[in-house]
């Protein structure tokens, strides 16, 4: 079982994410657990104050490192102690897959002006969900919980559900359709209704390649492109120069079957 421990000043912000939908069901089945730790419980003062003014002056308040340390020491040993910070490593699908293999993850969710810099000595990893600033780490924590928990074996009903997701294959996901078969003049592609699984798989791969090329071409160098992918991208209008930059393999060589020469029987 994978346990998520979130150290926060506002556990009520994370409680719904831990109790509802797929994560909530996974907790009921004993596949994951979520531990919400209120850092105010470790303040050791009458007013439960966890922050103080910054040395050197400046606006805002800074969360004390001794409070964070006591909160961490109240937990069982963690495989990773993670701090959410704009300076951290970018959180990606690859990182999510790595974290899903752990047993216990502890997360420090900051507020105000963040933590005393000495908290860096308590953490094993720093993560960022993007180049923007929020009011606290709880929203980032919810993102990581959702992304990692769904990768734990058994959490999703279909064990292959996440393997075709955007980024898991190195590409953006292909478009999905359901009923009605036609809506406001927009029909479901015929290939999806024909029952030919090989044709459906080829169509989906081509759609994923096109979406990625048009929207996130930066993903293609690391997407593990195949020779058939190269052929598909060339048909879409991608130049050979771009493909070379991405390290794409050569497209398959189309072999034309040679016609056997006609033979004439000699007259007897």
Curated annotation (Swiss-Prot):
Q: Which residues form a coiled coil?
A: none
**Has keyword ATP-binding?**
no
Enzyme Commission no: 2.1.1.228
Write out the annotated subcellular location: Cytoplasm
Q: Which CDD domains match?
A: TrmD-like (cd18080)
State the source organism's domain of life.
Answer: Bacteria
Binding-site residues for S-adenosyl-L-methionine, renumbered to this chain: 110, 129-134
Q: What general EC class does the enzyme of this chain belong to?
A: transferase
Q: Which SUPFAM superfamilies match?
A: alpha/beta knot (SSF75217)
Spell out the Gene3D superfamilies in the cross-references.
3.40.1280.10, tRNA(m1g37)methyltransferase, domain 2
One term of GO molecular function? tRNA (guanine(37)-N1)-methyltransferase activity
List the keywords (alphabetical): Cytoplasm, Methyltransferase, S-adenosyl-L-methionine, Transferase, tRNA processing
Q: Where are the stretches annotated Disordered?
A: 246-268
Q: Name one GO biological process term.
A: tRNA N1-guanine methylation
Q: Which InterPro entries match?
A: Alpha/beta_knot_MTases, tRNA_m1G_MeTrfase_C_sf, tRNA_m1G_MeTrfase_TrmD, tRNA_m1G_MTases_N, tRNA_MeTrfase_TRMD/TRM10
- Mind naming one GO cellular-component term on file for this protein? cytosol
Tell me what reaction this enzyme catalyses.
guanosine(37) in tRNA + S-adenosyl-L-methionine = N(1)-methylguanosine(37) in tRNA + S-adenosyl-L-homocysteine + H(+)
| UniProt keyword annotation of S-adenosyl-L-methionine present | yes
Tell me, in a sentence or two, what this protein's role is: Specifically methylates guanosine-37 in various tRNAs.
Q: How does it assemble?
A: Homodimer.
**Family stated for the protein in its record:** Belongs to the RNA methyltransferase TrmD family.
Q: What protein is this chain from?
A: tRNA (guanine-N(1)-)-methyltransferase
Q: Which organism is it from?
A: Deinococcus deserti (strain DSM 17065 / CIP 109153 / LMG 22923 / VCD115)
């Amino acid at each position: 079982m994978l346990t998520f421990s979130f150290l926060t000043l506002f556990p009520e912000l994370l409680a719904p994410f831990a109790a509802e939908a797929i994560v909530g069901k996974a907790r009921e089945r004993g596949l994951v657990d979520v531990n919400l730790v209120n850092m105010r419980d470790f303040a050791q003062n009458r007013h439960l104050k966890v922050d103080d003014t910054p040395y050197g002056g400046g606006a805002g308040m800074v969360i004390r490192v001794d409070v964070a340390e006591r909160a961490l020491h109240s937990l069982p040993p963690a495989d990773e102690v993670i701090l959410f910070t704009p300076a951290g490593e970018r959180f990606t699908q690859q990182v999510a897959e790595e974290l899903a293999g752990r047993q216990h993850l502890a997360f420090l969710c900051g507020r105000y002006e963040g933590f005393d810099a000495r908290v860096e000595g308590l953490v094993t990893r720093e993560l960022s969900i993007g180049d923007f600033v929020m009011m606290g780490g709880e929203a980032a924590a919810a993102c990581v919980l959702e992304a990692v928990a769904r990768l734990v074996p058994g959490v999703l009903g279909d064990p292959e559900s996440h393997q075709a997701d955007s980024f898991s294959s190195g590409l953006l996901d292909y478009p999905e359709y359901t009923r009605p078969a036609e809506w406001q003049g927009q029909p479901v592609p015929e290939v999806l209704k024909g029952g030919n699984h090989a044709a459906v798989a080829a169509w989906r791969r081509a759609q994923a390649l096109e979406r990625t090329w048009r929207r996130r071409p930066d993903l293609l160098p690391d997407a593990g492109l195949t020779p058939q992918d190269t052929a598909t991208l060339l048909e879409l209008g991608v130049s050979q120069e771009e493909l070379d930059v991405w390290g794409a393999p050569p497209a398959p060589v189309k072999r034309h079957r040679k016609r056997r020469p006609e033979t004439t029987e000699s007259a007897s």
